[in-house]
Amino acid sequence: MATELRCPDSMPCHNQQVNSASTQNPEPQQAGDLILAHAGGNSDSAATLTLLSGHAHSSVPAELDPQASGGATFNSENNGGTGNYDAPASDSLLGDCEISRQIGAQLKLLPMNDQIRELQTIIRDKTASRGDFMFSADRLIRLVVEEGLNQLPYEECMVTTPTGFKYEGVKFEKGNCGVSIMRSGEAMEQGLRDCCRSIRIGKILIQSDEETQRAKVYYAKFPPDIYRRKVLLMYPILSTGNTVIEAVKVLIEHGVQPSVIILLSLFSTPHGAKSIIQEFPEITILTTEVHPVAPTHFGQKYFGTD
């Protein structure tokens, strides 16, 4: 059963308009490095993308699905239809080398394996039942949340076992919280609570203005001491990046530094990741896949409104 959130009524709400050729490839420098070469450059313009471990998985297709498009009705990230968001045609993980360099240290990918690939496949499959979709989404969310917790600071501690022995272990440093970007980000809340029972969770509501299509903050409510906490920002699909950018701006207004924000997502386009890192170079993005086509039907199918 999902836990009802109770945040202090004293926190401010926001209602404001927000303006928002091939070359010879170099060798990886160390295990876990993925070399990204500029399509029109030379070996000096290679960039390194940080992987959490092991294997690099290429997920950029030779061509995009011609039917992968949809109109935006909820916000600038999630399209209302069942189609997918197409990143700009020129956008690719192998595109702008300078941006790839900036992404390198901040963008973290879960190591690809068959289990994760299957979950991604079911989530993208338009014929998947809602039950299968939710089951797969919850499993993938749990994997992302677990790795997100691994990015938080720990401290050493000593405990006594039932047999009387001393054990040197670690524990979370105090001062962590979650923030979900409504509505699709709420799908990740239970996964976080399953791992951290007592963690505080705030919310931000951002929608696209029907006339200008610009992101607009309608509501924000956080723990009163959020400026002292590490923040796990939850938003499953990064397509344009606009919604996340506005959410981070609201967090900054409440005293949160971008360097303590870890963005948890399931899927990201190259354009979305680049946009966020360009705006906030210190933020950390954790995702399972960077792909030009984002499954922006996620929120509608997860909550049964597709």
Curated annotation (Swiss-Prot):
Keywords: Cytoplasm, GTP-binding, Nucleotide-binding, Nucleus. 5-phospho-alpha-D-ribose 1-diphosphate binds at residues 183, 235-243. Uracil binds at residues 296-298. Gene3D superfamilies: 3.40.50.2020. Residues 1-28, 58-87 are annotated as: Disordered. It is found in: Cytoplasm; Nucleus. Its main location: cytoplasm. It holds the Pfam family UPRTase. InterPro entries: PRibTrfase_dom, PRTase-like. CDD domains: PRTases_typeI. GTP binds at residues 130, 139, 173-176, 200, 229. Residues 13-28, 70-79 have a biased composition (Polar residues). Coiled coil: none annotated. One of its GO terms (cellular component) is nucleus. One of its GO terms (molecular function) is GTP binding. Belongs to the UPRTase family. This is Uracil phosphoribosyltransferase homolog. It comes from Bos taurus.
